[in-house]
Regions:
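ATP-dependent carboxylate/acyl-activation modules
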Residues: 1-208
Length: 209
């Protein structure tokens, strides 16, 4: 998922007919529009596919997210362990779950900890299973076992990256991240870089430890 959610509020004041008419407009907000149509139940997969030519496989994935959204809203703030665990497995952020249940983000985080629902870090397979490889390159998720091996022998420093490169922004922020890591490594620290842009140099598996 990794947008906050598929609910934008842009279509709240639009009738069903207006929403369906908007489906003919090709723009970057179509995913939100499709979610709204599925939320209202005003068009079938076949109809959405016929207008947009988006494969029904993708439409079904959007529908799964919308169904989870409905379940969270319908729980009346009484989030049980299984519902919260499934919502986090599907990558719904704490702040969104909080908004839909009338709680604060801090309350959702504390509830997760109470239920033992925390992120795991899985190793990225940089060779796509073509042959065995181990790289210090991990992604976080709420599904599966943690694959990070603890190393308590060296002092560690975490460098926070600047995230995706925005339009009009240069690469100077990523340049700073990389050179920070290199300088800290030369001083003997074990370096950990946290970023959410897989296309930058700072997230190359051989930059940090």
């Amino acid at each position: 998922q990794h947008v906050d959610c598929l609910e934008t509020g842009d279509y709240d004041n639009m009738s069903d007919e207006e929403v369906l008419e908007q489906l003919h407009v090709i723009d970057d907000r179509r995913i939100y529009l499709i979610a709204e149509i599925l939320r209202r139940g005003i068009a079938s997969y076949d109809r959405i596919h016929e207008v947009t030519m988006i494969d029904e496989w993708f439409i079904d994935k959007i529908a799964i997210l919308v169904e989870m959204e409905k379940k969270i809203k319908a729980c009346g703030g009484k989030l049980d362990k299984e519902l919260l665990k499934e919502a986090k497995r599907m990558e719904f952020p704490d702040n969104v779950i909080a908004r839909w249940t009338g709680k604060t983000e801090e309350e959702i985080k504390n509830l997760r900890y109470e239920y033992g629902i925390t992120a795991a870090f899985k190793m990225v397979d940089t060779c796509a299973a073509e042959f065995a490889s181990e790289t210090p390159y991990y992604y976080s998720c709420f599904d599966g076992e943690n694959e990070v091996e603890d190393n308590h022998e060296r002092k560690k420093i975490m460098v926070l990256g600047s995230g995706p490169i925005r339009i009009g922004q240069g690469i100077e922020f990523d340049y700073c991240s990389v050179h920070s890591v290199w300088a800290l490594s030369q001083e003997g620290y074990e370096t950990i870089i946290v970023n959410n842009n897989p296309e930058t140099v700072s997230t190359d598996f051989d930059i940090a430890d």
